[in-house]
Regions:
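Flexible "cap/lid" loop of the alpha/beta hydrolase fold
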Residues: 1-44
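Active-site micro-motifs of SAM-dependent methyltransferase domains
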Residues: 23-24, 94, 131
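Short aromatic-enriched loop/helix-cap "lid" or pocket-rim segments at secondary-structure transitions
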Residues: 27-32, 106-108, 136-138
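Active-site nucleophile elbow and catalytic-triad environment of alpha/beta-hydrolase enzymes
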Residues: 68-84
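Short, conserved loop/helix-junction motifs that constitute active-site signature segments
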Residues: 85-89, 116-119
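Short beta-strand/loop motif that positions the catalytic acidic residue
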Residues: 88, 94-96
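Conserved loop-alpha-helix segment in the C-terminal half of the alpha/beta-hydrolase fold
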Residues: 96-129, 135
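Catalytic active-site module of serine/aspartate enzymes centered on a nucleophile-bearing elbow/loop
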Residues: 121-155
Length: 155
C-alpha cells in the first residue's frame, strides 16, 4: 500500500518502509500459506484481539474479504504495483527476515532486484525472526528504521 501511495502521490510520502512482503508478485505457495495462516489466526486469541482492535467488531468479515481479494490477485497474477518501480523516487527500505515463512523463499533476491530498479533503495534482512520482521524484533527494527530515516548506514 505504501509503495503504491508513493508511486501515485510522491508529494505526500517522504520515505517508505516495506517490511516482509513478497515483492512485485505473490509467490507460488501464497494462496495455500495465506489460507492456513488466516484459519490459524482466527483460532488464536491474540490474533483475534489484534484483528478486532484494527478492524472493529466485524473484523472476521473484513479479514475474509481481504483474504479473498489477495487470493484473487494471486490466481490472476495481478501486478501488485500501480506503476513501474523504476518511477519510484521516494527513498524506500526493503526490510525482512531470512526466516520468514509467510513470504517467498527468495525474498532477499527479490528485494535486490527491486532495489536495482528503484533509484533510492536500501535493504535490511534480519538473520532470524518471523513475519513481519518488525514484530519479531521490534527494538532492532526500530533502530534500523530510525537509521534509515536519518540517512545513516544500516548495520
Amino acid at each position: 500500500m505504501a509503495v503504491n501511495t508513493a508511486l501515485k502521490r510522491p508529494d505526500l510520502v517522504e520515505h517508505v518502509i516495506a517490511d516482509s512482503f513478497d515483492g512485485r508478485t505473490l509467490h507460488e505457495g501464497f494462496v495455500e500459506n495465506l489460507r492456513k495462516e488466516r484459519e490459524h489466526a482466527k483460532q488464536d486469541h491474540g490474533a483475534r484481539q489484534f484483528y478486532e482492535w484494527c478492524q472493529g467488531e466485524d473484523w472476521e468479515k473484513v479479514v475474509d474479504l481481504n483474504t479473498q481479494a489477495l487470493i484473487t490477485c494471486a490466481i490472476n497474477k495481478t501486478p501488485l504495483f500501480c506503476k513501474p518501480l523504476e518511477s519510484l523516487d521516494t527513498p524506500i527500505l526493503f526490510m525482512g527476515s531470512l526466516e520468514d515463512d509467510m513470504c517467498r523463499q527468495d525474498m532477499l533476491e527479490e528485494y535486490k532486484e527491486m532495489d536495482r530498479l528503484v533509484g533510492n533503495g536500501k535493504i535490511y534482512m534480519f538473520e532470524t525472526g518471523g513475519h513481519p520482521a518488525v514484530l519479531s524484533d521490534a527494538e532492532s527494527a526500530a533502530r534500523v528504521i530510525t537509521d534509515f530515516l536519518n540517512g545513516q548506514s544500516l548495520n
